[in-house]
Regions:
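Leucine-rich repeat
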Residues: 1-388
Length: 388
């Protein structure tokens, strides 16, 4: 539906009590400098879900009158029934802090029905703390630092989230806070502020392309969420033309500990494997994943392939490998190794292929860029087809 300016003026003049859309529950509101003054015509007292897209087409920040008009629209938004809200500016060049007070004001008016919030716009301490105390919040995509608390006054509760995304700039602040909340105690003996979230959280996404290390400290924070089914850690390793070290700092024992803690995983993405081949994890780390993560279907992980043939021979002597035969086979179908180097002569390809199939019998999709990985994938396909 496209409404011309003259029509919008008539709608405003003749607006009935309760507005033109009193029963509207879902609203996608694209705000520009051209339609800002009529955006309130589409607000409803019964809104449950709203997506706000702030479109600013210029390189310079929006002027005060734009922000004032936007604040007026937001203040008119009813939140009594609001359950879900997302707010996204279109222009990366805009200082998003300009919108902090405007959208913090609406968050502070959200009540117990509120369940989902997604926005890169920073929020005030008060607004963040308000979200933390909402009893039914189950989906939260965070793009900024957490609220600041004096050590003696950490929150005694945390929402029972099912899905948490920590975007760019959020991880370094939120991980320490989560560790503090897990270590704190509430009025009930043995219950921490994080107790409900530890049971409820199913999806955790960590998206930080600014050099976050995937190391034992960061993984230890994650391991308390033992019912996770989807864990994605998206970090950046330097490309072949860039200086810097691989950001994947886990070893085989760290992976084994993670696998034992997160046995419900169906998808595990630990960064995007890079070309450096300097990580401490070898193909041996796949064994505890296969043993303990009996529901896993997708895996992306850094592997050091320098001694891959010898590492596989050692796996064959590992008691855990013998244990695999008595366990339900791991349903993993996808293994992503991406830019990981692999240098194998033809005689070793079949050895490695057999070893991988022994660990992941259901593997069908092997994602590696090197020619040896592509050939290895063919060998694995042939082995699987030959056993059927």
């Amino acid at each position: 539906m496209i409404l011309e300016e003259a029509t919008l003026n008539k709608l405003r003049v003749n607006s009935p009590p309760g507005g033109w859309f009193p029963a509207l529950q879902d609203l996608y509101l694209c705000i520009t400098e051209f339609n800002l003054r009529c955006a309130d015509l589409f607000l409803s007292p019964r809104l449950k879900r709203i997506r706000i897209y702030v479109m600013w087409l210029w390189d310079t920040p929006p002027p005060p009158d734009f922000l004032q008009n936007l604040a007026s629209i937001i203040s008119a938004l009813s939140t009594s029934s609001l359950e879900q809200m997302s707010v996204h500016p279109n222009n990366q060049a805009i200082p998003w802090v300009l919108f902090e007070d405007i959208f913090s004001s609406i968050v502070l008016r959200c009540g117990p029905p509120f369940t989902e919030y997604d926005s890169p716009v920073p929020l005030s301490n008060a607004a963040l703390n308000h979200l933390i105390h909402l009893p039914h919040l189950h989906t939260w995509r965070i793009h900024g630092p957490p609220p600041t608390y004096p050590t003696s006054s950490l929150p005694l509760v945390f929402p029972p989230l099912r899905e948490l995304t920590l975007g760019e700039g959020a991880v370094r602040g939120w991980f320490p806070l989560l560790r503090c909340l897990e270590g704190g105690t509430s009025t009930t003996q043995g219950v921490t502020p994080l107790s409900r979230a530890k049971e409820s959280l199913k999806v955790l996404r960590v998206e930080d392309m600014s050099g976050l290390n995937v190391d034992p400290s960061s993984v230890s924070t994650i391991q308390c969420f033992r019912n996770l089914v989807d864990l994605r850690v998206r970090v950046h390793c330097p490309s072949r033309d860039e200086r810097g070290q691989c950001n994947f700092k886990l070893n085989n024992d760290d992976i084994a500990e993670l696998a034992m803690a997160l046995t419900q995983l169906q998808s595990l993405v630990l960064g995007y494997p890079c070309f450096k081949n300097t990580c401490l994890t070898t193909i041996a780390c796949l064994l505890p994943i296969s043993v303990h993560c009996s529901k896993l279907r997708k895996l992306k992980i850094h592997l050091n392939t320098t001694n891959i043939v010898d590492d596989l021979r050692n796996i064959l002597e590992d008691p855990q490998f013998q244990q695999l035969r008595s366990l339900p086979k791991c349903p993993l179908t996808y293994l992503g190794v991406y830019r990981t180097p692999l240098r194998l002569d033809e005689s070793d390809l079949e050895t490695v292929a057999k070893g991988i199939v022994d660990i992941f019998p259901s593997l069908t999709d092997f994602d590696g860029f090197e020619e040896s990985w592509i050939e290895l994938s063919r060998q694995i396909t042939d082995l699987r087809e030959g056993s059927e």
